[in-house]
């Protein structure tokens, strides 16, 4: 199965974060119409009703932890949502964290990620572990995680990473222009609008065409 995924926050336009169950179904159905088959929950565990919709409608899921760490509270957070969610067949991976900039690229991050990964596997050994990384390569989390999650691929030399870790799979966990195009026909960085998504908004972001070359 080839992953065609999207990175999604829990809120919905015009509604906020308290979504009725019918809107969970609506969202998953619309994503499937677009050709999407995988849903990354960012940056926290989802409501169970979303996972029910993914199970029912056939959407793969990356279920994500809110905060990395090795204190008892961090373990309790992981345990709580994993025990709640692990019987959902839609879940294909557990994410232990997102963009932990202070520890991504150092030995402290590698140790924390290794410890969290081992703990996660003690609760569920059937799914791969990932973490979404944004810039902290080479010496940290990316060295020890099962599946490397890449946020903003313009920040990493993928050939160098693959050469160093040839057996480590990777997937894109977050990309975005952080701009809007609806009803817009000009570029205005201050207003965060752009004429079209096939343009490169800022240096470390890629246009759609630029980004495709990194994905199989």
Descriptions of predicted regions:
Residues 1-114, 118, 129-130:
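Active-site-adjacent substrate/metal-binding segments within catalytic domains
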Residues 58-66, 146-153, 169-175:
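Short hydrophobic/aromatic-enriched beta-strand-loop microsegments
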């Amino acid at each position: 199965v080839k992953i065609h995924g999207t990175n999604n926050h829990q809120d919905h336009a015009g509604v906020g974060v308290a979504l009725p169950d019918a809107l969970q179904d609506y969202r998953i159905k619309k994503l499937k119409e677009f050709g999407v088959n995988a849903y990354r929950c960012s940056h926290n565990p989802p409501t169970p009703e979303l996972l029910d919709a993914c199970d029912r409608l056939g959407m793969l899921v990356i279920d994500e932890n809110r905060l990395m760490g090795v204190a008892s509270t961090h373990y309790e957070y992981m345990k709580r949502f994993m025990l709640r969610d692990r019987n959902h067949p839609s879940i294909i991976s557990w994410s232990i964290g997102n963009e932990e900039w202070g520890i991504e690229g150092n030995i402290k991050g590698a140790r924390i990620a290794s410890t969290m990964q081992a703990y996660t596997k003690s609760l569920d050994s059937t799914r791969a572990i990932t973490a979404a990384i944004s810039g902290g390569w080479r010496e940290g989390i990316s060295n020890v995680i099962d599946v490397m999650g890449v946020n903003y691929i313009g920040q990493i030399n993928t050939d160098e990473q693959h050469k160093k870790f040839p057996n480590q799979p990777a997937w894109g966990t977050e990309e975005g222009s952080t701009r809007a195009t609806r009803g817009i026909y000009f570029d205005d960085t201050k207003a965060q609008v752009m004429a079209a998504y096939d343009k490169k908004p800022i240096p470390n972001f890629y246009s759609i065409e630029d980004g495709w070359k990194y994905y199989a």
